[in-house]
Amino acid sequence: MFTESMLFLLLFLLLGLIAKNNSLIIAVAVVILLKLFHVDGKAMELIQAKGINWGVTIITVAILIPIATGQIGFKDLIDSFKSAAGWIGLGAGIAVSILAKKGVGYMAVDPQVTVSLVFGTILAVVLFRGIAAGPVIAAGIAYMAMQLVAFIK
């Protein structure tokens, strides 16, 4: 029961509790329950392979809700392009989306980076009162940094 992987998960759970990061606490608890109930490897592989896409879909739904409820309309979209902040927001949204795409690809090629990204995010939340922006974007930044390192070599 107390394997290395379980101890590792418990460490993340403890850090999530210290950081008061509900997303991490819930995620670790779900994975621990899957492990305790001996959910088969195929189900775990499916979650690992498709989980990020499922998460992106849920985030996209949440982003679209203000449009569906009428809180955001075409007037708001047009007004956003009348300010520097609107254009900067557009550029930032595009950049983050591209970084996230690169991050998903990078995590698939180098899964070990996921652990350090999650751990780094947790440390920033605990030590610097940062906000967990997500390992996908962090992986995209790591990807860009690794591309820069490869270019310099």
UniProtKB/Swiss-Prot annotation:
<comment type="similarity">
    <text>Belongs to the UPF0756 family.</text>
</comment>
<dbReference type="InterPro" id="IPR007382">
    <property type="entry name" value="UPF0756_TM"/>
</dbReference>
<feature type="transmembrane region" description="Helical">
    <location>
        <begin position="54"/>
        <end position="74"/>
    </location>
</feature>
<feature type="transmembrane region" description="Helical">
    <location>
        <begin position="6"/>
        <end position="26"/>
    </location>
</feature>
<keyword id="KW-1003">Cell membrane</keyword>
<protein>
    <recommendedName>
        <fullName>UPF0756 membrane protein lin1603</fullName>
    </recommendedName>
</protein>
<keyword id="KW-1133">Transmembrane helix</keyword>
<dbReference type="Pfam" id="PF04284">
    <property type="entry name" value="DUF441"/>
</dbReference>
<dbReference type="GO" id="GO:0005886">
    <property type="term" value="C:plasma membrane"/>
</dbReference>
<feature type="transmembrane region" description="Helical">
    <location>
        <begin position="117"/>
        <end position="137"/>
    </location>
</feature>
<keyword id="KW-0812">Transmembrane</keyword>
<keyword id="KW-0472">Membrane</keyword>
<feature type="transmembrane region" description="Helical">
    <location>
        <begin position="80"/>
        <end position="100"/>
    </location>
</feature>
